Regions:
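Short glycine-aspartate micro-motif
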Residues: 77-79, 105, 165-169, 191, ...
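Short beta-strand segments
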Residues: 81-82, 141-143, 167-171, 193-195, ...
Length: 378
């Protein structure tokens, strides 16, 4: 057995204990105090693993945690990207307590992505305790608002990515394949608002301007922008409008989700949505929102990075395959900044964002060993 894998297997129970502690420190994205409590604990843990932690203060979100480990044997840096905010609320751990069943640890945030943070922490601990030098200095960025769009962290993510030779993202992988992601779709979000004019639906219908009617035309037009052959989807997910059945609705609104494989498609859809014009005479159409995350692109450098990881995993005694998803992560930003990015390096798990979220316990030492060797070998 490879010495790094042997180390991880020997420390599997300690890894599990750390993960449980991280999960118990609940960290909803919008609760700065709770997120910062976990952040301070993580800073202490990474410092004990030989890394130098620095907090990047944020006013309305949790403070970002940057950790530096090295120096490496070569110039440059390798970036590891995590987030420690979750979609769950404080108190959810009482409703959905940690439990171990059939080799799985269930609990809020176990997979997304406190399991990935555990993997990263133990990768550094392993390098430190075995006296192994990473190929490049390791810079870990642990963010606090990934689940709500990363507005407070995007600039820092992109700046670090531009200085990095590779970006390794510890988001979870889905079992049993443990798929590493070489691509993700980009995302946009829009709100289409139609303003009409109210009137009595029975006595004076012609005096009104029906905002719901106008929006209905736009919804159908938006849905037709979807092109599955090239991976573009346009989804009208939430629609509101009107006040009472007997009142011509004066306002209506649609929230639109867009996914795309290329920036060319992002711009095509953006132009189409911003170009919406009223169909019902007298109505007004307003569009807010726009392009958020660029696509994480599968390219030659990304494929080479995956192939390196695949060979390391095989040498460690397990298999990983390659894939992608329509879901986005902060890896979209590192890829958009031009940094070769490999995602899905966290623990294997499923049920994300639900009370059935879990990680496969046996994947903790495997993924930590894989990440440690990727950092060691570059």
């Amino acid at each position: 057995m490879h010495p790094i894998m042997a180390y991880m297997q020997q420390h599997k129970e300690q890894m599990l204990t750390d993960l449980k502690t991280f999960v118990m420190l609940e960290s909803p994205s919008l609760d700065k105090a709770a997120v910062d409590r976990l952040g301070r604990h993580l800073g202490e843990q990474f410092a004990a693993a030989g890394a130098a932690p620095t907090f990047l203060p944020r006013t309305d979100r949790g403070d970002l945690l940057r950790v530096e480990f090295g120096p490496g044997s070569e110039p440059g840096q390798s970036m590891v990207l995590c987030h420690f905010d979750t979609v769950f609320s404080v108190g959810d751990i009482a409703k959905n307590p940690l439990r171990v069943e059939n080799g799985r640890l269930y609990g809020p945030g176990t997979s997304d992505m406190k399991g990935g943070i555990t993997v990263f922490l133990w990768a550094l601990r392993c390098l430190q305790e075995l006296g192994l030098t990473p190929r490049r200095k390791v810079v870990g960025l642990l963010t606090t608002d990934e689940e709500i769009g990363s507005a407070a962290s995007r600039e820092v993510i992109e700046a670090e990515a531009r200085q990095s030779a590779v970006a390794l993202v510890a988001e979870p992988a889905k079992p049993p394949e443990g798929t590493l992601k070489t691509w993700r779709k980009g995302t946009s979000g829009y709100t289409v608002t139609v303003i009409g004019k109210p009137a009595h639906a029975g006595a004076d219908p012609t005096k009104g301007i029906n905002a719901v009617e106008d929006l209905a035309h736009h919804i159908l037009a938006l849905q037709k922008l979807t092109d599955m052959s090239i991976g573009t989807t346009v989804t009208v997910g939430v629609v509101t409008g009107g006040t009472r059945p007997n009142v011509v609705p004066a306002e209506a609104q649609a929230h639109v989700d867009v996914r795309f494989m290329t920036m060319a498609e992002a711009y095509r859809i953006d132009g189409a949505i911003r170009g919406l014009t009223p169909v019902v005479p007298g109505a007004q159409v307003m569009v807010t929102g726009g392009i958020n995350r660029p696509p994480m692109v599968r390219n030659e450098a990304t494929v080479a990075l995956f192939q390196r990881a695949q060979a390391i995993a095989a040498d460690l005694g397990f298999a990983v395959d390659e894939g992608g998803t329509g879901g986005a992560s902060d890896g979209n930003f590192t890829s958009g900044a031009g940094c070769p990015t490999l995602d899905g390096l966290g623990a294997c798990g499923d049920g994300l964002h639900t009370f059935e979220e879990y990680i496969e316990i046996d994947s903790l030492p495997e993924r930590a060993a894989l990440l440690a060797r990727l950092l060691q070998e570059g």
